[in-house]
């Protein structure tokens, strides 16, 4: 699979998995380096391996869904626990695991752009690295769950470095009157950034229904998911 630099992702699909049983998986990444002769060679000392399981389809009689959203990492003087620092959300992950869910639903604000470090919004190369740094925190917090449970993820406003997102087919409206960039239509970040967020958060979902890309160039992800005894609509309602 080709490497997508802006989102630091590889995208691939595996067919023929037996949904009636748990199936182990293993993803192996072998980076390449340039040797003294200027040739690209495998860097076997830096091989990375990621392992988990594809869960068996649950019974149609009952299914438990864990819903997680708005994962703040730090709130300054506001303390909802003994430290006021929630990352890496160990208590949340532990309590979710204790419920033994069959499906995870991350309902938005998987990150907050200003948490722990200020948001970088330009230039685009630096903004993408800033986002990836904060997205990796999400994997750090919930990776032990997502490596063994199917997950539905829906981005919200802070995932795309926005305080509010007001539809308008993604088209950024001009600033008028007292409507700031946060409160007018569309995304304030460019399509390249929004699409990188989509590749990291929603690319694993079933293929979108309808047009895969808006006129402004932003990808879509509204789709359907059937799992166990449930049939779900995944909506991009921002």
Positions of PLM-derived features:
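Metal-dependent phosphoester/phosphodiester hydrolase catalytic core
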Residues: 1-238
């Amino acid at each position: 699979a080709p490497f997508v630099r802006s989102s630091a992702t590889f995208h691939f699909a595996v067919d023929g998995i037996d949904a009636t049983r748990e199936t182990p998986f293993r993803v192996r990444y072998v980076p390449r380096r340039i040797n003294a002769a200027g040739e690209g060679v495998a860097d076997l000392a830096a091989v990375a391996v990621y392992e988990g399981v594809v869960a068996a389809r649950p019974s149609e009689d009952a299914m438990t869904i864990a819903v997680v959203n708005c994962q703040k990492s730090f709130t300054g003087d506001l303390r909802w626990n003994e430290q006021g620092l929630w990352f890496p959300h160990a208590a949340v992950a532990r309590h979710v695991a204790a419920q033994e869910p069959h499906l995870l639903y991350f309902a938005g604000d998987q990150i907050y752009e200003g948490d722990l470090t200020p948001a970088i919004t330009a230039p685009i190369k630096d903004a993408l690295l800033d986002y990836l740094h904060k997205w990796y925190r999400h994997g750090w917090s919930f990776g032990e769950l997502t490596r063994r449970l199917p997950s539905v993820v829906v981005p919200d406003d802070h995932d795309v470095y926005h305080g509010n997102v007001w539809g308008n087919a993604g088209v950024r409206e001009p600033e008028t009157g007292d409507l700031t960039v946060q409160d007018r239509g569309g995304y304030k970040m460019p399509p390249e950034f929004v699409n990188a967020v989509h590749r990291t958060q929603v690319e694993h979902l079933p293929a979108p229904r309808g047009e895969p890309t808006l006129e402004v160039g932003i990808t879509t992800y509204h789709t359907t998911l059937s799992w166990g005894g449930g049939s779900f609509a995944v909506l991009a309602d921002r």
